[in-house]
Amino acid sequence: MDSGLQQLALCLFFILCRLFQATAEDDWKIATATLSRDRDGSSSVATGGACGYGDLRQSSFAGYSAGLSGKLFNRGSSCGACLEVRCVNHIRWCLQGSPSVVVTATDFCPPNSGLSSDYGGWCNFPKEHLELSHAAFTGIAETRAEMIPIQYRRVKCGRRGGLRFSLSGSSHFFQVLISNVGLDGEVVGVKVKGHTTAWIPMARNWGQNWHSSLDLIGQSLSFEVTLKGGKTIASYDVAPPYWRFGMTYQGKQFHS
């Protein structure tokens, strides 16, 4: 190969490397974050919130949770999503080296129309803002910080065990909370099947609670779950015929 072709090949190589690097960096989006606090000002770990997960200290993500502003929460469809977050561009508040943490979307951060979106109304539409649990916030920034600039990107959720189906309702109102979801974590469709019925679509009630006006008492239950990314998994006979409201049963798990 003559020198001209070698130089051209080398030039193309560096261009492709730069394009790959730019694409990787484009995965990160700009937002802001604050530490989730109780009314008395003490830091707290969210306990379920608008996604309905309950006591997060019992979850597989060990308190690494986040409440999302309305633009990110998307009326509950983002519940269960996993976000990698890092503090950037603030030498005083960001931890050295800009380490990142992975959080699970578990709550809604409500707007405050009485305050400016630049001071206090962090979750006003259309701001992209995360309210982080104590473990998550202190993993990337100083606790004393009031509001920090961050970058975030969606990542796959690493979960131990199978999908969890928590049952509630009555003889004419059947509801299931779906949690511990792997891959993108965002459930967009659910079907239920009793041993005497066909697959029946369920509707999102709130967060990751799905419901249907069915009487399935006394039937074994199977569930079909579809993620935002398009993958579907069916867990057959998850709950036996003698299942009870208030119980949680485990099914299959999504894997990449």
Curated annotation (Swiss-Prot):
A Pfam family hit: DPBB_1
Its membrane topology: Peripheral membrane protein
Name of the featured protein: Expansin-A20
Domain named Expansin-like EG45: residues: 48-162
Keyword Cell wall biogenesis/degradation: yes
Gene3D superfamilies named in the record: Expansin, cellulose-binding-like domain, RlpA-like domain
Record's signal peptide: 1-24
GO biological process, one term: syncytium formation
Domain Expansin-like CBD positions: 172-251
Keyword NAD included in the entry's annotation: no
Function as written in the Swiss-Prot or TrEMBL entry: Causes loosening and extension of plant cell walls by disrupting non-covalent bonding between cellulose microfibrils and matrix glucans. No enzymatic activity has been found.
Gene: EXPA20
GO cellular component: extracellular region; membrane
Similarity-based family: Belongs to the expansin family. Expansin A subfamily.
Native source species: Arabidopsis thaliana (Mouse-ear cress)
Keywords annotated in UniProt: Cell wall, Cell wall biogenesis/degradation, Membrane, Secreted, Signal
Localization of this protein: Secreted, Cell wall; Membrane
Matches recorded under InterPro entries: Expan_Lol_pI, Expansin, Expansin/allergen_DPBB_dom, Expansin_CBD, Expansin_CBD_sf, RlpA-like_DPBB, RlpA-like_sf
